[in-house]
Amino acid sequence: MKKTQTWILTCIYLQLLLFNPLVKTEGICRNRVTNNVKDVTKLVANLPKDYMITLKYVPGMDVLPSHCWISEMVVQLSDSLTDLLDKFSNISEGLSNYSIIDKLVNIVDDLVECVKENSSKDLKKSFKSPEPRLFTPEEFFRIFNRSIDAFKDFVVASETSDCVVSSTLSPEKDSRVSVTKPFMLPPVAASSLRNDSSSSNRKAKNPPGDSSLHWAAMALPALFSLIIGFAFGALYWKKRQPSLTRAVENIQINEEDNEISMLQEKEREFQEV
C-alpha cells in the first residue's frame, strides 16, 4: 500500500514539474501592476482636457508584437510621468494629483526593471527612435492603459524574433493614438486589471502569429506532461501486474489449504467418535 502511494505522489509531482513552464508563459511582469492603476480615471478627470503632455511615442504598437515595443514604451512613459509629477505640488490642492501620479511612476518604474530582466538581448529592432509628441490627458493615458494591458501577456521573446516595422508607418497613422478615436478607458476595478481581456480585445492588440505561438507554448508542455504521465502509469501497472497475479494465486492456494485442513480435522473428529 505504501509503495502504491509513493508511486502516485511521484506521478503528481512530475506533472506539476512539467506544467511549471506552462505557468511561466503567463505574463511574467503581471504581478508588478497594482490596484493603484484604477486611479487613472480620477486623474484624467482632474486634468484640463486641453492640457498637453509630452511623450516620446514608439511607433509600431499596432503592427508589432508587444515584446517589440513595450521595453521602449515603458521607459518613455516613466520619463513623461516623472516630468508630469514635477509640475504638481505635493501640498494643498495639488496633493491628490501628485499622489496618483507618484503611484503610477512607481508602477512604471517596476515594469521597467521587469522588462530589463526578461527582455532578449539579441532582439533586433529596426524602427526609428521615438520622437516627442504632445498628447491630451485622454490620449496619453489611453497609451498608458494599453501598455499596462500588454504586460498581462508579456513573455520572454525568442532570440530569433525580429521586430521590423515599415518605414512608412508614422505616429499620425497609428490608430492607437488617433485623436478622432473616442476615449475608452478599460474598467478600473482591480479584478479587471488583473484578469484577461476579452477575446476581441486580444485580437486587436496582438497579431495572429503572436497568439498562435502563445497557445503553442501552452499546449506543448501540457501534451508532453500527459504523455509522460501515461508512460509512467503504464510502466507501474506492468510492474505491478505479475505481483498482483501471484498474490491472487497465493490467496486461492491458502483458501484451498484451509479447506483441506478443515476437512481433515472433521474427518479425525468423526473417526474418534
UniProtKB/Swiss-Prot annotation:
What does altering R32C do? Answer: In WS2F; uncertain significance
**Which Gene3D superfamilies does the protein's record reference?**
1.20.1250.10
Q: Which residues lie on this side of the membrane: Cytoplasmic?
A: 238-273
- Complexes and interactors: Homodimer, non-covalently linked. Heterotetramer with KIT, binding two KIT molecules; thereby mediates KIT dimerization and subsequent activation by autophosphorylation.
UniProt disease link: Hyperpigmentation with or without hypopigmentation, familial progressive: A disorder characterized by hyperpigmented patches in the skin, present in early infancy and increasing in size and number with age. Hyperpigmentation has variable intensity, and sometimes is associated with cafe-au-lait macules and larger hypopigmented ash-leaf macules.
Q: Where is the signal peptide?
A: 1-25
Of which family is this protein a member?
A: Belongs to the SCF family.
Q: Please give the residue ranges for the topological domain Extracellular.
A: 26-214
Membrane-crossing ranges are: 215-237
For this protein, the record's InterPro entries field holds: 4_helix_cytokine-like_core (IPR009079), SCF (IPR003452)
Site feature Not glycosylated, where: N97
Enumerate the Gene Ontology biological process terms.
Answer: cell adhesion; ectopic germ cell programmed cell death; embryonic hemopoiesis; extrinsic apoptotic signaling pathway in absence of ligand; hematopoietic progenitor cell differentiation; male gonad development; mast cell apoptotic process; mast cell migration
Keyword check for GTP-binding, yes or no: no
Q: Name one GO molecular function term.
A: growth factor activity
Give a single Pfam family match: SCF
Q: Which residues are glycosylated?
A: N90, N118, N145, S167, T168, T180, N195
Q: Which GO terms describe its cellular component?
A: cytoplasm; cytoskeleton; extracellular region; extracellular space; filopodium; lamellipodium; plasma membrane
Q: What is the effect of changing L104V?
A: In WS2F; uncertain significance; reduces secretion
Q: What is this protein called?
A: Kit ligand
Q: List the disulfide bonds.
A: C29-C114, C68-C163
SUPFAM superfamilies, per the entry = 4-helical cytokines (SSF47266)
